[in-house]
């Protein structure tokens, strides 16, 4: 007859209960593929809620829960094909931060003139149609003019835009001027985009630029997001970019890589799917070095009038394919 196990002492029972409730389950616990202790979800949630003063949040809850924000000295790459919404994703993140926190932001934009960037940020923040705003200003509409002027003196006084192609030394000088202007250190910086930084545009040059920006963000002690063009061999426009999609690389330097793409470019879509995806945009966490290394692909509504990116509502789906034309 097999020998029965000895009863546990009260001390042994307490020790086992403490071990089971601990977030550190030791080396003897299997490495599960599909489950993890619920305590990790609460840990992630608490960190997400409490890190307002630490890490910069992008304002997309699913992405923020995966990345848990961007800390000082960390670099994020936002990768995708041209005109696929990469910059727009970060513009929305900037506006969310300006509206909901006391964030001060430095934007390096050698790709677009600062006037155009300012217009896009205003339309996102105030839900304005870009064409209508331009027409109001042309017509001398006082309400529209006052809205723009008031926003520039208040909300948008916490963002500074430089549209030159600056060296790393010049970027540091710009940072010092921003610190002097605000009397404080900025919370976040954006570069749009990597390939337009001074230097060679071949593989060696692009990697050197990525390494230089990473080094700059650490020395400047600032969270940095960098727009990075997808290479020609990175796949179809309507599919998520892989981790190596960035033109000539550079992804090794980043804490995380976000792939931005639009399913509207898929030639196999049905008519109904074309209508739906004519206003959709996908943000994919392609790589994430922050434990527990969560990834994911998240779909949002991209307003064709204001440039706002947010979750879908029922009335967001167009009745026809007007935005595909």
Regions found by a protein language model. Give the residues of each.
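C-terminal regions of RecA-like/P-loop NTPase motor modules
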Residues: 6, 11-22, 32-39, 127, ...
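The Walker A/P-loop phosphate-binding site
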Residues: 19, 23-128
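Cytosolic-facing regulatory segments adjacent to core modules
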Residues: 65, 101-185, 297-299
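Conserved catalytic network of the ASCE P-loop NTPase/AAA+ motor domain
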Residues: 68-70, 99-101, 151-154, 180-183, ...
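Flexible loop/turn segments at secondary-structure boundaries
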Residues: 84-86, 113-117, 168, 196-200, ...
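Alpha-helical scaffold elements adjacent to nucleotide-binding pockets in ATP/GTP-utilizing enzyme cores
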Residues: 93, 116-121, 174, 212, ...
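Structural recognition of the conserved hydrophobic beta-strand(s) that form the central parallel beta-sheet
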Residues: 107, 190-191, 222-229
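Phosphate-binding/switch loop-helix module in NTP-utilizing enzymes
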Residues: 158-219
